[in-house]
Amino acid sequence: SIRHGKKTVHEKWNVSTAILAGDAMLAISLNLLTNAKYDYKIIEAFNKGLLTVCEGQALDKEFEEKKNISEKQYLNMIEKKTSYLIAMSIEIGALTYELNKKDVKKMFNFGISIGKAFQIQDDFLEIMSNTKKMKKSLNSDIILGKKTYPILLCNQKNNDFMIELMEIKDVKKIIQELRKFIIEKNIDNE
């Protein structure tokens, strides 16, 4: 896998090193939060965010094994997996500046909306863009059986097409057929 034009940690080294690096980054984050004179609300927001992102990632992995998921399930998953990370970051910034509770909530909700928009756009770009532009591998979601927003919309338009598509073994061909279907059915404008 490629992210921002570079190999991911698990690709460059291995999965164990990637997990260890993630654990180390978490420990550093917690040290920064607990060593500073931050209000408990900031640490609470961080911990809640961390758990929520883990739950979202678990749902994403679970959905790989499911044949179909609903739009509601998808939106719940991306809210937890992607949106919550952005919302938590904004919320912590708002708490650091000691904004009132109402404004903190507005900022958090703004982060949720930005996160959903980002993830849906990223899902479409994975199919409709190219590796050079995106600076990341674009077939990983297809290979892993991820339930992305374009896949969900394609399923809603024609479930038989998606079943036939998954029988194709060539990932490049799958992406070509998906692009064609998305454009023909005007799915990218929904």
Model-derived segments and spans:
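All-alpha prenyltransferase/terpene-synthase fold signal
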Residues: 1-190
